Amino acid sequence: MNYSVPFYHVFVFMGVSGSGKSTIANAAAYHLHAAVLDGDFLHPRDNIKKMSSGHALSDSDRYPWLKAINDAIFAMQSTNKLSLIVCSALKKSYRNILRMDHSNLSFIYLKGDFKTIQERLQARKGHFFQSQMLITQFATLEDPGNDEKDVWLVNVNQSLQCVINATIKIIEDVIRSHIEESS
């Protein structure tokens, strides 16, 4: 696909921890030659310590992190034709913070059932997220509604390759529709 288009676009990979956000974003970035940023790297030190000790973040904990990701979206839209960012974006209010001042932004919602995600988290090594916090994340999660036209759903209760392929197709389709609209 040719990405020499007159606009820049960022896709945020959202969902609970264990849904495959980083894995899918990295695979899609490789295939599409896109820049990729894991939003976890933008968490303030206190947030990382809090999560590492097994405590969930409050909205006030998340706000500076979400603002940092919003700034990263601006920077990436200024320098890359196609960028992918990993961020849980569990609530509509969080997604709205990310949307502020960004028209070329879409979300890829990696959705899975609790049992599948829990099994993935229990098998994961070297991540500060504690699997017992999954219950809290599912309770916090606000599924995007019909009013969020910039959110695309991918079911992660299928093979990794199927999820990657579905995600790449969505990104290509969104870009293609923008090209057609600008023609």
Residue ranges of predicted features:
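Conserved lysine of the Walker
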Residues: 21
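The conserved Walker
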Residues: 17
